[in-house]
């Protein structure tokens, strides 16, 4: 980290820091003075929210961040998932971004990968609503890359 990072949390808000979950009891500002892996509560996707292929990929990438002891397993799941998604999607924008997301995770930048995945949700929703990705394929992806269910 080149400089300090300051974030503000509201009372009752949670933050995931290096695998630990913290809840603050009052409004507080945190200042990170060195490198840290964190995820704000409003960016955490619960398993039941991982209902589309990209949301499933997001869930797996977030596990790399918030579960350090399971990082190797989550990274292996991510590799399997990204490979599958690269063969299923036909949209050039999604394909290019998936390759960039893969590179981000490969270089230890899972947080940036999460942001990039969220940026693809609208395109994915459009693809799914127009049945450009057949529902049977979506279901196959769901079964293949959703072992937490």
From Swiss-Prot:
Has a post-transcriptional repressor function in flagellum biogenesis. Associates with the 5'-UTR of fljK mRNA and promotes its degradation. The gene is flbT. This is Probable flagellum biosynthesis repressor protein FlbT. NCBIfam families: PRK00794.1-1. GO terms for molecular function: mRNA 5'-UTR binding. Keywords: Bacterial flagellum biogenesis, Repressor, RNA-binding. InterPro entries: Flagellum_FlbT (IPR009967). The keyword Repressor applies. Signal peptide: none annotated. One of its GO terms (biological process) is mRNA catabolic process. Pfam families: FlbT. Belongs to the FlbT family.
